[in-house]
Amino acid sequence: MSWQAYVDEHLMCEIDGHHLTAAAILGHDGSVWAQSSSFPQFKSEEITNIMNDFNEPGSLAPTGLYLGSTKYMVIQGEPGAVIRGKKGSGGVTVKKTNQALIFGIYEEPMTPGQCNMVVERLGDYLIEQGM
């Protein structure tokens, strides 16, 4: 299965009638493996800062998580594994695998829990596959 198919079929899928706003799979170096057409244009330092937070959990909390120049308030995640951000009625979930970062961005009516489930389920599967 292509990386784009993972984005299209496993991240941008329908959950209780709702979809993520945007999704992507990136390498740890910030290279885009696949993304939805709606995924924001990001800066390389934004991905570097996200990777730094996985290595030093809590480092993003004071400044916030920036993605595509949008600032998300960092909320409870799983240190070294999942970073979650909130902005207004939406947010972002980032799951780190051995080689990739899985991103899901949502807006209401999708819930944070639905976004977490979609992103983390794919991330856990890729980890099981050695990715």
UniProtKB/Swiss-Prot annotation:
CDD domains the record matches: PROF
Any one annotated GO CC term: cell cortex
Cystine pairings recorded for this chain: C13-C115
Any Pfam family the entry gives: Profilin
UniProt KW Phosphoprotein keyword: yes
Segments carrying motif Involved in PIP2 interaction: 81-97
Location of this chain's protein in the cell: Cytoplasm, Cytoskeleton
Keyword annotations: Actin-binding, Allergen, Cytoplasm, Cytoskeleton, Disulfide bond, Phosphoprotein
SMART domains, sorted: PROF
Listed GO MF terms: actin monomer binding
Job of this protein: Binds to actin and affects the structure of the cytoskeleton. At high concentrations, profilin prevents the polymerization of actin, whereas it enhances it at low concentrations.
Name by which UniProt lists this protein: Profilin
